[in-house]
UniProtKB/Swiss-Prot annotation:
Motif Nuclear localization signal per UniProt: ranges: 26-32
UniProt-annotated catalytic positions: D514
Required cofactor(s): Mg(2+)
Region (Interaction with Gp41): 7-31
Zinc fingers typed CCHC-type, residue spans: 393-410, 414-431
Region (Interaction with host CALM1): 8-43
Lipid group attachment sites (N-myristoyl glycine): G2
Domain Integrase catalytic, first and last residues per copy: 1202-1352
Binding site for Zn(2+): H1160, H1164, C1188, C1191
This protein's name: Gag-Pol polyprotein
Family annotation (PANTHER family): ENDOGENOUS RETROVIRUS GROUP K MEMBER POL PROTEIN, RNA-DIRECTED DNA POLYMERASE-RELATED
Domain Reverse transcriptase: 632-822
Pfam families: Gag_p17 (PF00540), Gag_p24_C (PF19317), IN_DBD_C (PF00552), Integrase_Zn (PF02022), RNase_H (PF00075), rve (PF00665), RVP (PF00077), RVT_1 (PF00078)
Length: 1436
């Protein structure tokens, strides 16, 4: 009888009773049919409980079907009934029995087909299991074949560059993504990085240098290649420009192999290192907020530089906590200090938004900030599903609402607060049974079940449970604390039917707890009192019952009084009328999914941050919130054995009296392992495939549905304090993912993916896009079937503890998803409304531009250039900006565009992608990506000027790169381009200027604003045209300059300039030559800057002078521009150089000064680096630094670079446990030598230095000005060991930055091993061993020991090579060419071989046979005079 009572309930029962017995008939299925079917199954020896599930019905149908042909009519009726029941369980919409039988037959046929296809699919899968992990794999024939790099990898690389912007993290990410790649794959990765031309040019230069070095070290063997042997790769082959893919695979898989992919990858990483250094040249100490700089911009600069800092994570955390506040401007600093140490970055940015003006404004804001609500950081509370509205708190002592008895200020009422009698307290009152458990309850098992701890529940397989909680009158807090068991509620899981023993008017009965039943119905019980007859809809039809009022019922010691019905019910039922009185709730437990293991960072312990004091109001609010969370199993109480703590606080919700609990997890986040975000971006609707049926779901209480790893829970401990320390604080820890913890997003995404995986496999026809807690579900099923699948998905998620609230379940279009509006056959952005304003502030315009940028992805033609021009310069957010005429016109055009709604189409994989680009006006481009005309998948705009001097072709290539990157991300492939440019113009540009080998597939489209090149540069000198040697010079101090030219026909002209620079004078000289010359001209310059601008063929520029040069170039018929190195004795160049330098240049003519100045302007390198890199005297290198205004910071010490030469050590004394530790650090490697010395004297220090010099090559020591380091003993030791000693800047710890940092690191390690050693000196040596041998990191992932050995080993051959080079460079070579009998020279000797020499003549490197070369020693330029500095500098 039990099975008959619980086969169907709720919505399924309603669906059952709507199905007709026959098509067109009147009779419908009723519960009596299920009762009959249950009895019939018992006759056939089948378990009636199988009727409760779809799988059970399927098993019954499988047993009955073979007997149908020979069975009776009753057997056929039974089969029909179970077939209809199966459809109800599966939520298949049927109207009658015949339709249900048809559906069953259809399902059975599909199952047969799957069974037949399974072996074939298994064979196919076996054949296709080729490794996808590496680009080169072995096929079935044993041949090595290449797999193209996947769009997913390219997408990840593009995201890395876009998000990290060449910060140091880019290099290991590139290395990981390019594992095993061929040069062609590596070029594909480089070509997807479109918007970083300067960085790509640097990378190209590095690759060219490395390729040339490869060719020098691997000369080509003379003679033909033997048959069957491959040629050896040249540098350009390794770079993938002159080799085919087949050759690359053959080299990489040959015997012996030549790993061209790894070699090319190494070159790229060298280039990336240079780029990273260029993008991160600033010290974190220099990052200070300007007086009017927005706080948001300051924070961006701070963290961008912080990521590039070479420091430990602890140091970086300290910098974030202290330097960020210290270096803010005074107004922001006042606010930040008022916020306190608990403030997050988001709170700081909210507080400091728009700050400026007088200091009193900052104080006012700081006071107001105490009431600011940060909704984004608030921790969402997850309520139980069936608890009803939250009850207001009422005092049991005075009877007033708003506080509890524990906090009541009224005189304490005598006696019991429940019954009023004296002699006992409320918790002992017999009228209220506070303790739910007794020694023996009338359970079937004979004992009361205990409520398991939260840890067990979190991993239990239950999908839902019943729990009895407190009644309508809550216990006082004092009572709850005294009883100690008020939260150990009975728990009944629903894996079995919830049948318990209850006491009704003293009689014991077994009854089913049924939250779906309205009334309590019992059978075979005699109750006292009057009754009245009643008819109710029961199991098997209507039944007649007797209704008794005011019946006493007791369950688990809880008493209730209510109405009871007595009649012929198949099972005794306790309905909602009694359960609600007892506080019984239906609870969804924490997800039973497997927890993700989480650890702390190596060597770190959990947070031990003290709880700061809280107001009484906040303590009360937190106590209530935590009680609710504990009931729901999200947190658990802990004892004093847990030593960890994280501070908590509470803030009020905006426009509400309710409170939010916030936990300051910053310290735990610093100590928690790092996580990789499993999703690199949000999905775009243009990449969605068109689906017949769509639904959008939202997962409720997402984080609180996923359990936290059991071993990690202790680190989330927090404490609720008491007012005036009245009682010890209440301690809790989290059982679920906490809000604000760094691991919650990644673990939730990973868990959700695992949960959805089986559903995706079982339902391949259903597409699910998952982003955090938003789910987009699409299919080509009919709407009824689709909704059944949605219900299956919701049920699947519910089984794992994830609820999908009905109010956020979108069933009908349009669907609002991720900021978009989705329709069945089209999509658009959610409606964009532009505000109408008389006056616009900076903040208004920023929001307006953001809206227009968002709308531009589907509304073609939107422009924002003029609006963005209004935001130039550092302006306050509240500053009113007048609109220019151009901006007003642009805004009016955009309003017109947005009036008509525009929709995008969905992606069809069977059709090709087409991208069409149009030029809208000056520096503004729009594009559309579509598959069918007039049905755009996506539109966009481009209006960036990436360089000051550009032209339309260059901008068009940037647009193409942007579209290609977008397409790879969204669709995984590159579209065919339709470009407004002639084929000849396009191909000319790509041939001359593109930095890599990839050219997209494209075709010409004749739309307005055709792109063209306005002038053409000749590639060879023009015969018969006059040659102009041009040059310019300027004095940095006086800003005076000269520009001029000298021609090969004797003409010359020099003009004086004021308020100019070296770069401007070089351009002015070219402009002068263009003005004075005829229609055809050759110009020779020694300026790389000017050459780079003009070779790019710009047709517009931000510089007025460059625009004037462009106008002159357009007038020329032919124009040739060449570059020669400065100060090399080249005739015309040397003449014009002397003319323009007269009275202008102060610095001597030394080879490398110009390059050093250019590099210093870019990188602000120190004088030592320039002296080394460009072979300059120290006095000249220091003069360059001294003349740079950015390197002379007023009122501040100069922050130079740490000298990392191989022989430099920093020494310092530090103190621990009252003893002195002398520490020496090898600056370049971080290797440590340390000892405990008896006294801080010169003698002990000198002995330590000599011992250090006996172990390692020490050339220089850098110390502070302590008396022991300045002593005569130390000076004597340094003199004897030939060690140079330098001293730091007094009272400036940064001058000893390396050793100071290592002191902290050493002390930290000593603290970790101190309990293992009896004496401090032992612990110091243990810590030194750990640091040098057991800690790896930095470049290459080496330990300090490996790094110092590698540095010394590399330094020895480098010095030997330098000796050989210096010997060779003392010689000069005079030589003859094969056809020219005249001797040329002198040239530099680079290498001398048996049969030939390699020489450098000017900038050209040549190979000359020994018989045609004369090698002589160079004795200097005697003609120039002995004291000619210029002459001496030309000697190498």
């Amino acid at each position: 009888m039990g099975a008959r009572a619980s086969v169907l309930s709720g919505g399924k029962l309603d669906a059952w009773e709507k199905i007709r017995l026959r098509p067109g008939g009147r009779k419908k299925y009723r519960l009596k049919h299920l009762v009959w079917a249950s009895r019939e199954l018992e006759r056939f020896a089948l378990n009636p409980d199988l009727l409760e599930t779809a799988d059970g019905c399927q098993q019954i149908l499988g047993q009955l079907q073979p007997a149908l042909k020979t069975g009776t009519e009753d057997l056929q009726s039974l089969y029909n009934t179970i077939a209809v029941l199966y459809c109800v369980h599966q939520r298949i919409d049927v109207k009658d029995t015949k339709e249900a039988l048809g559906k069953i037959e259809e399902i059975q046929n599909k199952n047969k087909q799957r069974t037949q296809q399974a072996p074939a699919a298994a064979d196919k899968e076996k054949d296709s299991k080729i490794s996808q992990n590496y680009p080169i794999v072995q096929n079935a024939q044993g041949q090595m074949v290449h797999q193209a790099i996947s769009p997913r990898t390219l997408n990840a690389w593009v995201k890395v560059v876009e998000e990290k912007a060449f910060s140091p993290e880019v290099i290991p990410m590139f290395s990981a993504l390019s594992e095993g790649a061929t040069p062609q794959d590596l070029n594909a990765m480089l070509n997807t990085v479109g918007g970083h031309q300067a960085a790509m040019q640097m990378l190209k230069d590095t690759i060219n240098e490395e390729a040339a070095e490869w060719d020098r070290l691997h000369p080509v063997h003379a003679g033909p290649i033997p048959p069957g042997q491959m040629r050896e790769p040249r540098g350009s082959d390794i770079a993938g420009t002159t080799s085919t893919l087949q050759e690359q695979v053959a080299w990489m898989t040959g015997n012996p192999p030549i790993p061209v992919g790894d070699i090319y990858k190494r070159w790229i990483i060298l280039g990336l290192n240079k780029i990273v250094r260029m993008y991160s040249p600033v010290s974190i100490l220099d990052i200070k907020q300007g007086p009017k700089e927005p706080f948001r911009d300051y924070v961006d600069r701070f963290f961008r530089v912080l990521r590039a800092e070479q420091a430990t994570q602890d140091v970086k955390n300290w910098m974030t906590d202290t330097l960020l506040v210290q270096n803010a401007n005074p107004d922001c600093r006042t606010i930040l200090k008022a916020l306190g140490r608990g403030a997050s970055i988001e709170e700081m940015m909210t507080a400091c938004q728009g700050v400026g003006g007088p200091s009193h404004k900052a104080r006012v804001l700081a006071e107001a900030m105490s009431q600011v609500t940060n909704a984004s950081a608030a921790i969402m509370m997850q309520k139980g599903n069936f608890k009803g509205p939250r009850r207001t708190v009422k005092c049991s002592n005075c009877g007033k609402e708003g506080h509890i008895a524990r906090n009541c200020r009224a005189p304490r009422k005598k006696g019991c607060w429940k019954c009023g009698q004296e002699g006992h307290q409320m918790k002992d009152c017999t009228g209220r049974q506070a303790n739910f458990f007794r020694e023996n309850l009338a359970f079937q098992q004979g004992k009361a079940r205990e409520f398991p701890p939260e840890e067990a529940r979190a991993n239990s397989p239950t999908s839902r449970e019943l729990r009895v909680r407190r009644g309508d009158h809550p216990l006082s807090e004092a009572g709850a604390e005294r009883t100690g068991t008020s939260f150990n509620f009975p728990q009944i899981t629903l894996w079995q039917r919830p049948i318990v023993t209850v006491k009704i008017e003293g009689q014991l009965k077994e009854a089913l707890l049924d939250t779906g039943a309205d009334d309590t119905v019992l059978e075979d019980i005699n109750l006292p009192g009057k009754w009245k007859p009643k008819m109710i809809g029961g199991i098997g039809g209507f039944i007649k019952v007797r209704q008794y009022e005011q019946v006493a019922i007791e369950i688990f010691g809880k008493k209730a009084i209510g109405t009871v019905l007595v009649g012929p019910t198949p099972v005794n039922i306790i309905g909602r009328n009694i359960l609600t009185q007892m506080g019984c709730t239906l609870n969804l437990p924490i997800s039973p999914i497997e927890t993700v293991p989480v650890t702390l960072k190596p060597g770190m312990d959990g947070p031990k941050v003290k709880q700061w004091p809280l107001t009484e109001e906040k303590i009360k609010a937190l106590t209530e919130i935590c009680l609710e969370m504990e009931k729901e199993g999200k947190i658990s109480k802990i004892g004093p054995e847990n030593p960890y703590n994280t501070p908590i606080f509470a803030i009020k919700k905006k426009n509400s009296t309710r409170w939010r609990k916030l936990v300051d997890f910053r310290e735990l986040n610093k100590r928690t392992q790092d996580f990789w975000e499993v999703q690199l971006g949000i999905p775009h609707p243009a990449g969605l495939k068109k689906k017949k049926s769509v639904s959008v779901l939202d997962v409720g209480g997402a984080y609180f549905s996923v359990p936290l790893h059991e071993d990690f829970r202790k680190y989330t401990a927090f404490t609720i304090p008491s007012t005036n320390n009245e009682t010890p604080g209440i301690r809790y820890q989290y059982n679920v993912l906490p809000q604000g913890w760094k691991g919650s997003p990644a673990i939730f995404q990973s868990s959700m993916t695992k949960i959805l995986e089986p559903f995706r496999k079982q339902n391949p026809e259903v597409i699910i896009y998952q982003y955090m807690d938003d789910l987009y579900v699409g299919s080509d099923l009919e709407i009824g079937q689709h909704r059944e699948k949605i219900e299956e998905l919701r049920a699947h998620l519910l089984r794992w503890g994830f609820t999908t609230p009905d109010q956020k379940h979108q069933k009908e279009p349009p669907f609002l998803w991720m900021g978009y509006e989705l329709h069945p056959d089209k999509w658009t952005v959610q409606p964009v409304k532009l505000p109408e304003k008389d006056s616009w502030t900076v903040n208004d315009i920023q929001k307006l531009v953001g809206k227009l940028n968002w709308a531009s992805q589907i509304y073609p033609g939107i422009k924002v250039k003029q609006l963005c021009x209004l935001l130039r310069g550092a302006k306050a957010l509240t500053e009113i900006v007048p609109l220019t005429k151009e901006a007003e016109l642009e805004l009016a055009e955009n309003r017109e565009i947005l009036k008509e709604p525009v929709h995008g189409a969905y992606y069809d994989p069977s059709k090709e992608l087409i991208a069409e680009i149009q030029k809208q006006g000056p520096d503004q481009w729009t594009y559309q990506i579509y598959q069918e005309p007039f049905k755009n998948l996506k539109t966009g705009k481009y209006a960036k000027m990436r360089s000051a001097h550009t032209n339309d072709v260059k901008q068009l290539t940037e647009v193409v790169q942007k579209i290609a990157t977008e397409s790879i991300v969204i669709w995984g492939k590159i579209p065919k381009f339709r470009l407004p440019i002639q084929k000849e113009t396009w191909e000319t540009w790509w041939t001359e200027h593109w930095q890599a080998t990839w050219i997209p597939e494209w075709e010409f489209v004749n739309t307005p604003h055709l792109v063209k090149l306005w002038y053409q540069l000749e590639t060879e000198p023009i015969e018969g045209a006059e040659t102009y040697y041009v040059d310019g010079a300027a004095n940095r101090e006086t800003k005076m300059g000269k520009a001029g030219y000298v021609t090969d026909r004797g003409k010359q002209k020099i003009v004086s300039l004021t308020e100019t620079t070296n770069q401007k004078t070089e351009l002015q000289a070219i402009y002068l030559a263009l003005q004075e010359s005829g229609p055809e001209v050759n110009i020779v310059t020694d300026s790389q800057y000017a050459l780079g601008i003009i070779q790019a063929q710009p047709d517009k520029s931000e510089s007025e002078l460059v625009n004037q040069i462009i106008e002159e170039l357009i007038k020329k018929e032919k124009f040739y521009l060449s570059w020669v190195p400065a100060h090399k004795g080249i005739g015309g160049n040397e003449q014009v150089d002397k003319l323009v330098s007269s009275g202008i240049r102060k610095v001597l003519f030394l080879d490398g000064i110009d390059k050093a100045q250019v590099q210093h302007e870019k990188y602000h390198s120190n004088w030592r680096a320039m002296a080394s890199d460009f072979n300059l005297p120290p006095i000249v290198a220091k003069e360059i630094v001294a003349s740079c205004d950015k390197c002379q910071l007023k009122g501040e010490a100069m922050h130079g670079q740490v000298d990392c030469s191989p022989g430099i050590w920093q020494l310092d004394c530090t103190h621990l446990e009252g003893k002195i530790i002398l520490v020496a650090v090898h600056v370049a490697s971080g290797y440590i030598e340390a000892e405990v010395i008896p006294a801080e004297t010169g003698q002990e220090t000198a002995y330590f230095i000599l011992k250090l010099a006996g172990r390692w090559p020490v050339k220089m020591i850098h110390t502070d000005n302590g008396s022991n380091f300045t002593s005569a003993a130390v000076k004597a030791a340094c003199w004897w060991a030939d060690i140079h000693q330098e001293f730091g800047i007094p009272y400036n710890p940064q001058s000893q930055g390396v050793v100071e940092s290592m002191n902290k690191e050493l002390k930290k390690i000593i603290g970790q091993v101190r309990d293992q050693a009896e004496h401090l000196r032992t612990a110091v040596q243990m810590a030194v061993f750990i640091h040098n041998f057991k800690r790896k990191g930095g470049i290459g992932g080496y330990s300090a020991r490996e790094r110092i050995i590698d540095i010394i080993a590399t330094d020895i051959p480098t010095k030997e090579l330098q000796k050989q080079i210096s010997q060779i460079q003392k010689f000069r070579v005079y030589y003859r060419d094969s056809r020219d009998p005249i001797w040329k020279g002198p040239a530099k000797l680079l290498w001398k071989g048996e049969g030939a020499v390699v020489i450098q003549d000017n900038s050209e490197i040549k190979v000359v046979p020994r018989r045609k070369a004369k090698i002589i020693r160079d004795y200097g330029k005697q003609m120039a005079g002995d004291d000619c500095v210029a002459g001496r500098q030309d000697e190498d």
